[in-house]
Amino acid sequence: MLFALTIAFYQVPKIQADLSENYEEIRIHNTKVEARLKDWIHRAKSHAQALETSNHKTIARWRKQMQHIQFKNEAEELQRLNSIINDDVVYRDDYTHFHKKDFWADPETTLEEGGDCEDIALLKAASLIRLKWPHNRMHLLVGYLTERGKAESHAVLLVENRKGEQFILRSITNDVVRPGHFKFTPIYAVDGEGTIIVKPPKKN
């Protein structure tokens, strides 16, 4: 019954969507990347209760802010959530933080201690799931940022709205943009279903 109600909730009237700016996607499998995401999901679930009960000031503020933005329209939820997390979470690179080259921290750790671009993007995904966004509309997108004069490894959260239009939640700025609207070369995305080779949208 609950499953049926959930499906019904997401059955909205068809609205003309602009998919021309979406990334092109080719579904593949990368066992290493998918294992890392599976491990992150396991750790995130094990820390879920702490997010609801912790008195840490950043986590308590995050809970309160999530309540304030829930049930707003999709565009407003994305913009508010992106600004909240970017403003609250301190950037810390993995080598300084964990003494590892690359590590995906769980949401509790990221809120309490800060994190790098992957950690921040994954925290945004966990926050959207808390706001009842379906997990299959979110992807961790990895590539190279080129807007600062050189290619830098970077990751962001790629989200699809109910019409199937893709949006990127930036972390260097608070902007929520369509693919191709900032200088970023995508390589791959990963979600609960596997890995996706991502290509920039075709130009008309």
Task: Show which residues each predicted segment covers.
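A structural boundary/capping signal
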Residues: F9-N204
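Bacterial N-terminal signal peptides
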Residues: M1-T6
